[in-house]
């Protein structure tokens, strides 16, 4: 079977987003596609850029480091995975926006390092609206305190909105109550605190149409755009700097020498 052209796939995705916007009385211009390139090579970043996608999402700081260095295009880079405190400095140097701020402690760490290096990062608060123990994110009832703290104590940080991940399900409709709850939480925070939180980062390949219907302004799409993620073992570059500067694709073997980590 002939491999489908990426632009054709993207057109179908955009058409589905447009239909979801029409069903919910929204403008398609209000929804951004974030291309999730985790475990794929740097070439998919270039492919997404050429097709008109201007935002790339990565789960891991280390992977973004070599991939961004290997990319010749200029998308925005967003961190969508959990951020450890010891990775904050590197994350601030790499990413334009961090979707996964989940505590006052992490916000304070970001503020401290951002002030040191002169950064002004955009951030989203990750909220675990489903209550799943396997999910990162603060509890919904903690969000008000965190928002107030950031507004009052973190002038370097630009808080743009909220992010969540719905539990996995084969039925996209199962995600709807979780997306609705995040939107309602956002509305409550805006009303009670008097702060604008325009961004709702919610919806992935299996449920993005439902997310758009419920108010998502940023859908995080990987598999639906690029196919299944490569079946790989974790690898680490052993070249100088350990971040594969100038590498083309550490995962496919087109980059520097790598060592398999068992």
Question: What are the language-model segments listed below?
Answer:
Residues 245-248, 252:
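Short Gly/Ser/Thr- and charged-rich N-terminal loops/segments
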Residues 216-234:
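Gly/Pro- and small hydrophobic-enriched strand-loop and loop-to-helix capping segments
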Residues 239:
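Terminal substrate-recognition subdomain of acyl/acetyltransferases
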Residues 1-206, 212-214, 226, 261-262:
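Conserved alpha/beta-domain cores
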């Amino acid at each position: 079977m002939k491999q489908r052209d990426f632009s054709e796939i993207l057109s179908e995705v955009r058409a589905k987003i447009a239909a979801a916007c029409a069903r919910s009385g929204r403008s398609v211009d209000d929804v951004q596609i974030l291309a999730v390139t985790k475990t794929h090579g740097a070439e998919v970043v270039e492919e997404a850029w050429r097709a008109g996608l201007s935002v790339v999402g990565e789960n891991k700081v280390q992977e973004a480091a070599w991939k961004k260095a290997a990319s010749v295009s200029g998308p925005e880079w967003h961190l969508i995975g959990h951020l450890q405190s010891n990775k904050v400095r590197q994350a601030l140097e790499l990413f334009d926006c961090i979707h996964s701020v989940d505590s006052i402690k992490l916000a304070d760490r970001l503020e401290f390092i951002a002030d040191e290096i002169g950064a002004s990062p955009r951030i989203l608060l990750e909220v675990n609206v489903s209550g799943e123990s396997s999910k990162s994110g603060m509890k919904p009832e903690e969000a008000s305190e965190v928002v107030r703290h950031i507004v009052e104590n973190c002038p370097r940080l630009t808080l743009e909105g909220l992010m969540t991940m719905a539990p996995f399900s084969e039925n996209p409709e199962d995600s709807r109550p979780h997306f609705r709850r995040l939107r309602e939480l956002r509305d409550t925070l805006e009303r009670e605190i008097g702060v604008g939180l325009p961004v709702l980062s919610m919806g992935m390949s299996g449920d993005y149409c439902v997310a758009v219907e419920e108010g998502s302004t940023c859908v995080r799409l990987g598999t639906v755009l690029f196919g299944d993620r490569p079946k790989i073992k974790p690898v680490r570059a052993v070249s100088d700097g350990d971040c594969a500067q100038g590498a083309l694709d550490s995962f496919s073997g087109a980059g520097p020498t790598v060592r398999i980590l068992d």
